[in-house]
């Protein structure tokens, strides 16, 4: 479904739908998921095990192009999933997802440019759900193959996806002025 929201705040809509926002920390430089806590210190991302508090990885981004958008990451079996995001109109070598093997210090894949600038992404099995859009540019919700970085499919939206939540077989997508609920 698609519903105009009158330019509402994302948290108002998620509260009304009884959803919790994913990976939101108390500070801009820290966030968490069910298994890990992530903390930015300068240009390094420290990854801690939830529960033990043990630091298991320190990821040093090789250039400013390797940048995680705010409060979002995903780590499974030593593979780190993140994104490079630049604010502004489309340009080459920006706004993409990537998978990085932390054990072997190796980039495994990166998605096409302009496939990610939403505030978060959701991993569901072998699919990464994320979005891209900007003023005077096409706005899409993407399905990206988690193993290859290839775009599986995309859904045109009226505005750029902001926050994405998966719950009870539905995908809730907030944009600047529209809210979407998609059976998944």
Where are these regions (language model features)?
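Short loop/turn segments that connect beta-strands within beta-propeller blades
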Residues: 50-52, 101-104, 145-149, 184
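A short loop-to-beta-strand structural motif that recurs across blades of beta-propeller domains
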Residues: 44-46, 95-98, 140-142, 178-180
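Short, solvent-exposed loop/turn segments at conserved positions within beta-propeller repeat blades
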Residues: 39-41, 88-94, 133-138
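Aromatic (tryptophan-biased) beta-strands that constitute blades/sheets of beta-rich domains
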Residues: 1-23, 54-64, 106-113, 140, ...
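Residue position within the beta-strands of beta-propeller blades
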Residues: 39, 81-82, 130, 173
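Blade-level signature of beta-propeller repeat domains, shared across WD40, Kelch, NHL, RCC1
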Residues: 162-184
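Eukaryotic tandem repeat interaction scaffolds
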Residues: 59-122
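Repeated scaffold domains used in trafficking and secretory/extracellular systems
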Residues: 10-11, 16-32, 63-76, 113-125, ...
């Amino acid at each position: 479904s698609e519903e105009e929201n009158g330019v509402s705040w994302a948290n108002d809509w998620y509260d009304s739908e009884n959803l919790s926002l994913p990976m939101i920390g108390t500070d801009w430089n820290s966030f968490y998921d069910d298994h890990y806590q992530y903390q930015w210190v300068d240009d390094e991302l420290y990854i801690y095990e939830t529960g033990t508090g043990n630091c298991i990885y320190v990821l040093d981004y090789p250039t400013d192009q390797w940048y995680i958008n705010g409060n979002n990451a995903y780590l499974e079996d030593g593979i780190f999933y993140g994104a490079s995001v630049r604010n502004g109109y489309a340009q080459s070598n920006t706004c993409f997802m990537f998978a990085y093997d932390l054990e072997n210090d190796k980039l495994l894949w990166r998605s096409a440019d302009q496939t990610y600038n939403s505030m978060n992404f959701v991993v569901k099995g072998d699919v990464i759900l994320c979005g891209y859009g900007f003023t005077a540019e096409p706005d899409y919700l993407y399905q990206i193959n988690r193993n290859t970085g290839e775009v599986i499919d995309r859904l045109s939206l009226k505005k750029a996806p902001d926050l994405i939540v998966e719950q009870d077989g539905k995908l809730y997508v907030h944009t600047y002025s529209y809210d979407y609920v998609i059976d998944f």
